Every structure is written in C-alpha cells, then in structure tokens.
C-alpha cells in the first residue's frame, strides 16, 4: 500500500525546541509592546495638541471674561455692564449728595484737592467732578490713586465710567493738572430698601507715590529753569569776563 | 487709613472704572471748559442741573477732540444728543451766534 504523508495543517508545538519556543514568546511580547508604545504616543500627542489649543484660546477667553466681570483688575469694557437704559435719571424727590475728599501720602510732595466739595445727583444721572493735583517738588514723580466710598454698603451702586485711579500718573516738577471723575449712581439704588436712609455718599481718593525697584518712579526734572532778563545779562557778563577777546598779534607785526 | 470704611468686606474689593483712566491734560487744552462747568456748579449750589450737564458735555467733547478720550455716542455717556440745528457747535457757540 502506498504510504502517503499526511499534510501538516496543525502547528505542533511539541516538536519545537526550547529555544524556538522562547523566540516565539519574545516575538509576541515585542509586538504587544510596540502596540502599547504607539497607543501611549498617540495619547500623549493628542493631549499636547489639546493643551496647545487651550493655550491659544486662553488669551481671547481671558480677555472676554475680564471684559465682562472686571476680574484681575482689568477695567470692564463690555458695553452690557453700563447699558444706555442704566444712564437714564430716576425721577425721585430727593437727590443724593456726593461729597469729595482727598488725601496724599506723606512721602509724596504733591497737593491734591477736590475742585468742588459736593454734587447732588439723581440715580442714573451721569455727573462730572474734578480734582486738582500739583507737584511741589523739583523732580518728576509718578503717583497712583486709590479710592474708597463711604458708607461701604453704597459702594456697589457707585459706578465710575472714567477717572484717574488705579493707573500711574506722572507729574513733572511744578506741574499742576486737573483730574476729572465721570460717574453715576446706579438706578437700582432708588429701589433698594437698604439704601432708603442713605442721603450722602463720600468719595475719597488717596494718592500714593509709585515705587520701582530701580528708582525710576522719581526722576530729575527735564525742564531747565527759565532765567529772567537780569540773570541772562549777568550770565553774559560773566561769560565775557571768563572768556577774554583773542588778539591777533600778526596784525600788529605787519603794522 | 482715614476714610476707609471697615464695616463691609465688599468695600475692600474696589471696582475699576469702566473705561480706565483719563489721560492727563498736560497742556491744559480743556481747562476753559472745566472752569465754565465749575462756575455753573457754584451757581446752582452743586446740583447736577441740566445746563451744567451740557457744559460737562462740552468738556468731554473737548477731550474727545484733543485725543484725551475715546469717541463715543452721547447716549453711552448718559448725556443728551446734540440739538439738530447746532451742527456740532458747543452750546456756548450757539448762544453767542444768537
């Protein structure tokens, strides 16, 4: 009878040597490790791309949030905070007296006073007031103003549209400057029962001297002092004495 | 610190002004309008009367014209619009022409 060999369809692991089995196991392990490494790489790269996108989006998002809420001390520039309907005066019997006071730090050689003692306003009515600052020293100085409002409960209704606070203001030596404040009392003030007995609001500004690490907040004046006519004449006379006229001796020799 | 209210924590979080700080008028370009406004306030015992508000409007217009303030509509500043016949002149100019 013909003895035909049966074809090998099954993988007979028993016929492999120990070394061959070890190689197969390592091959499988390497393939699995490669797959895991690629998966981890994809995850990390996608996270990196996500955070890069967040970083780019953070700047406009932060600006939008600050414009809406004033977070971080950035002035609120979103128009929705002071819409036009908030700037319509409320028709009430009594007006609110806004008093203006001021104070200067002792180390700041400025004079800083309000130009008017008070103003009587209606809620929702915009008003303009002026302070005046004068630098008495012989140096250019940078000052910065902060404000406080009394009583404190009314501070939430005091809305400043534009003023001179929270930014550095540089006054040259001897300079005098008018500083306006443009503000209004929120119309909700009239309907708040807690504000019923408040007839006076005090706006108090304090000017401090700015301080830089390198001392550049105070600088020497760039303006030269102006001399009057007598001083000029004396100066010219001194110049004439100190600089005698040069005589050309060659003329005398030729004569 | 005198004048600082200590009774409320909300006062310790001051809100910045809506449009930041006015630029300083170093050259005194709008001093004339300010003096007229302050004189008007004295006449009405510091009540925020309409004629004084019109002078305040002249002052703010001067600041806008001299790049000391951003241009804006008067309704956004709570002030009345210009009268149609004035052609942008100030109230004082309109009064002088009459």
Swiss-Prot record, chain B:
GO terms for cellular component: cytosol; mitochondrial intermembrane space. InterPro entries: COX19 (IPR051383). Keywords: Cytoplasm, Disulfide bond, Mitochondrion. Residues 1-10 have a biased composition (Polar residues). It is found in: Cytoplasm; Mitochondrion intermembrane space. Required for the assembly of mitochondrial cytochrome c oxidase. The keyword Signal does not apply. Disulfide bonds join 30-62, 40-52. The keyword Mitochondrion applies. Present with 5750 molecules/cell in log phase SD medium. Residues 27-70 form the CHCH domain. It comes from Saccharomyces cerevisiae (strain ATCC 204508 / S288c) (Baker's yeast). It comes from the Eukaryota. Belongs to the COX19 family. A motif (Cx9C motif 2) lies at residues 52-62. Residues 1-25, 76-98 are annotated as: Disordered. Its main location: cytoplasm. One of its GO terms (biological process) is metal ion transport. This is Cytochrome c oxidase assembly protein COX19. One of its GO terms (molecular function) is copper ion binding. Transmembrane segments: none annotated. A motif (Cx9C motif 1) lies at residues 30-40.
């Amino acid at each position: 009878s013909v003895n035909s060999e049966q074809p090998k369809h099954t993988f007979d692991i028993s016929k492999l040597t120990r070394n061959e089995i070890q190689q197969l196991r390592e091959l499988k392990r390497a393939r699995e490790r490669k797959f895991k490494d690629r998966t981890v790489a994809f995850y990390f790269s996608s996270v990196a791309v996500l955070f890069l996108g967040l970083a780019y989006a953070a700047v406009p998002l932060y600006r939008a949030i600050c414009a809406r809420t004033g977070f971080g001390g950035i002035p609120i520039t979103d128009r929705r905070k002071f819409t036009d309907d908030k700037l319509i005066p409320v028709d009430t019997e009594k007006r609110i007296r806004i008093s203006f006071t001021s104070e200067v730090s002792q180390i700041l050689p400025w004079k800083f006073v309000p130009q008017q003692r008070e103003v009587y306003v209606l809620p929702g009515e915009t008003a303009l007031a002026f302070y005046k600052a004068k630098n008495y020293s012989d140096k250019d100085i940078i000052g910065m103003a902060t404000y406080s409002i009394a009583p404190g409960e009314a501070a939430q209704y005091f809305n400043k549209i534009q003023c001179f606070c929270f930014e550095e203001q540089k006054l040259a030596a001897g300079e005098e400057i008018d500083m306006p404040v443009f503000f209004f009392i929120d119309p909700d003030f009239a309907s708040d029962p807690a504000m019923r007995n408040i007839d006076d609001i005090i706006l108090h500004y304090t000017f401090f001297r700015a301080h830089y690490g390198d001392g550049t907040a105070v600088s020497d004046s760039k303006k030269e002092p102006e001399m009057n006519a007598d001083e000029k004449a004396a100066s010219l006379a001194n110049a004439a004495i100190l600089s005698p006229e040069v005589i050309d001796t060659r003329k005398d020799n030729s004569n | 610190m005198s004048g600082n209210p200590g009774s409320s924590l909300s006062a310790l979080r001051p809100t910045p002004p809506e449009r930041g700080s006015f630029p300083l008028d170093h050259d005194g370009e709008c001093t004339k309008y300010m003096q007229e406004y302050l004189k008007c306030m004295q006449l009405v015992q510091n009540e925020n009367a309409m004629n004084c508000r019109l002078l305040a409007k002249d002052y703010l217009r001067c600041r806008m014209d001299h790049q000391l303030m951003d241009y804006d509509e008067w309704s956004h500043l709570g002030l009345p619009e210009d009268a149609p016949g004035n052609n942008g002149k100030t109230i004082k100019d309109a009064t002088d022409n009459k």
